[in-house]
Amino acid sequence: MFEGFDFSKMGQMLEDVQKQAKQMEEESKNKEFGAKSGGGLVSVRANGSGEILDISIDDSLLEDKESMQILLISAINDVLKSVEADKKNTASRMLGGLASMGIK
C-alpha cells in the first residue's frame, strides 16, 4: 500500500490536502443547484452548502395548502440530494488526488 512512499514528505502532503479541501469547499459554496416539482409550479434553489437561496411558488397553489406542502417537500428534497451528490463527487475527486501524491 505504501510501496515507494516517502514518509518524510508527509507533512507537506497533509498541508496540500488541507489546502485542496478548503479550495473545493469554497468552490462548492459558490455552486447553485435547482429543483422543480409539480411541473414547475414550485422551484427551489440552494447553494453547495445546502442553504436554500430561493423558493418560487406559482400563484395557483396559494389556495391549496396541502398540494403546496407536498410539492415544496419534493423540490427541497431533490435539491438537497443534488447538493449531497456534488459533495460526494468532490470528496471522490479529492481522494483520487491522494493517489497522485503517492498514496495507493
Curated annotation (Swiss-Prot):
One of its GO terms (molecular function) is DNA binding. The keyword DNA-binding applies. It holds the Pfam family YbaB_DNA_bd. It is found in: Cytoplasm, Nucleoid. It comes from the Bacteria. Gene3D superfamilies: Nucleoid-associated protein YbaB-like domain. Keywords: Cytoplasm, DNA-binding. Homodimer. Binds to DNA and alters its conformation. May be involved in regulation of gene expression, nucleoid organization and DNA protection. This is Nucleoid-associated protein Ccon26_18480. It comes from Campylobacter concisus (strain 13826).
